Design a protein with these regions (language model features):
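Short hydrophobic beta-strand element within catalytic cores of glycosyltransferases
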Residues: 287-289, 309-312, 316-319
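Nucleotide-activated donor-binding/catalytic signature segment of Leloir-type glycosyltransferases, i.e.
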Residues: 252-279
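Conserved donor-binding/catalytic core segment of Leloir-type glycosyltransferases
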Residues: 7-9, 165, 207-233, 241-242
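Carbohydrate-associated surface elements
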Residues: 170, 192
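Conserved acidic donor-binding segment of nucleotide-sugar-dependent glycosyltransferases
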Residues: 331-343, 352-357
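N-terminal subdomain of nucleotide-sugar transferases
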Residues: 1-62, 110-111, 134, 163, ...
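A short, well-ordered alpha-helix in the C-terminal region of glycosyltransferases
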Residues: 345, 352, 359-373, 385
């Protein structure tokens, strides 16, 4: 097996409450554990998490197995509230174009023998790298914005050393159609989980004497379906609902709604660290993922890291009935699905599951066993094998 040096290029903010940075850090860590020499290049961005550790390995609860380098960057986010949106988008476009070119030049100067790994969110960098015939893995988590399609088409046409990766089958199909990439060349790999972090978590027991605790972990942005969950909580007052995640305005809105409606059975805990999350999973009786079915991204392209953490935690899961979820789990076998955006159906499924201890245990066991298939290490191993199909030396 050839051991590659890998440089991961990212434009994300670190540390961050966003799941994309958790995925990036875990991928870098898993590649390093596999034997690759890994460097992560990230921009300097203004940190929005109060009191967050500046030690990224501590923040993401990972051992130090790879190197992280901060690349100079002009963070325009502070201007967003003070200038018209059209002006901000134009400035941001120019800023991103200049920085991504600078990032590639920084890579060439310091790491030009490395295989590049990056998400699809760097269109200018991807286009420039393709012209230089540098080998690269491009991981797609959604379809590129229409304004950048030409950059991606040209990039994959220019370079035979670009390896496309998609997190769902439907995303791979759309990438193939729109970008003109052979479907068979696209590696389909969903997200993953650090199994070891949940090793001590036990399968849910059949004891239903205590007050039931339903837990949601994740972002509070509209397409995550937290509004549906809150609606269910208003009806099911005999059940505790714990919501973990969210910062700033998103969290403030939910807090205001909770207070206005006197929802004493809703506990808003805000953002919690990767180190603490397994403990909160352990305290839950049921975990919930109520994503909307009104957006293409959630219905076809989503492979949320939280789903795999839920699976590894050994707790029964209720989730929106989305094609992207069905790619991983089977209804009534390893998960209980409800009609997306339908609070009545969600309420019925909560009542059904909470009244059936045997079903709770069945779903928990099956999903936890299936989670072993989706470890970060297994994901990296599949990438390593796929690389061999391409002449990138």
């Amino acid at each position: 097996m050839k051991t590659y040096r890998i440089t991961y290029l990212s434009n994300s903010r670190f540390p961050s409450e966003m799941a994309n940075t958790v995925q990036i850090m875990n991928m870098c860590h898993a590649m390093a554990e596999y034997g690759f020499k890994v460097n992560l290049l990230k921009p300097y961005r203004i940190n929005q998490i109060s009191g967050a550790s500046t030690d990224l390995f501590e923040f993401y609860n990972l051992s130090k197995r790879f190197d992280i380098h901060t690349v100079k960057f002009i963070d325009l986010s502070i201007l967003q509230k003070f200038i018209p949106s059209l002006m901000f988008r134009s400035l941001n476009y120019i800023n991103n174009m200049l920085w991504e070119n600078y990032l590639v030049n920084y890579y060439i100067k310091n790491y030009n023998k490395d295989l590049i790994y990056m998400r699809h969110t760097l269109p200018f960098a991807i286009h420039k790298i393709s012209k230089l015939n540098i080998p690269a893995i491009v991981e797609f988590h959604s379809m590129p914005s229409k304004r950048y399609i030409k950059y991606y088409k040209d990039a994959f046409k220019n370079s035979k050393k670009f390896i496309p990766l998609a997190i769902t089958k439907l995303l791979a199909e759309d990438i193939s159609k729109v970008l003109g990439i052979d479907f068979n060349d696209i590696l389909i790999l969903p997200s993953a989980v650090n199994i070891n972090k949940f090793a001590s978590n036990k399968i849910v027991s059949s004891n239903t004497e205590k007050k039931l605790n339903i837990t949601y972990v994740g972002s509070l942005i509209p397409n995550r379906g937290v509004d549906i969950l809150i609606t269910a909580a208003k009806v099911l007052k005999e059940i505790n609902f714990t919501i973990i995640g969210g910062v700033g305005e998103d969290l403030s809105k939910i807090k205001s709604y909770k207070e206005k409606n006197d929802l004493k059975n809703v506990n808003l805990l805000g953002f919690k660290s990767q180190k603490d999350l397994p403990l909160y999973y352990q305290k839950a009786d049921i975990l919930i993922l109520p994503m909307t079915g009104k957006e293409v991204h959630t219905t076809k392209y989503a492979s949320p890291s939280k789903l795999f953490e839920y699976m590894a935690s050994g707790k029964p899961i209720i989730a929106s009935d989305l094609i992207s979820i069905r790619e991983i789990l089977k209804n009534n076998e390893s998960i209980l699905l409800f009609e997306p955006d339908n609070s009545k159906d969600l309420i019925n499924k909560i009542k059904l599951l909470s009244s059936d201890p045997d079903l709770m245990i069945k779903l928990s066991k099956n999903s936890k066993n299936l989670a072993k298939k989706y470890s970060w290490n297994n994901r990296v191993e599949k990438i390593q094998k796929h690389i061999q199909k391409f002449n990138i030396d």
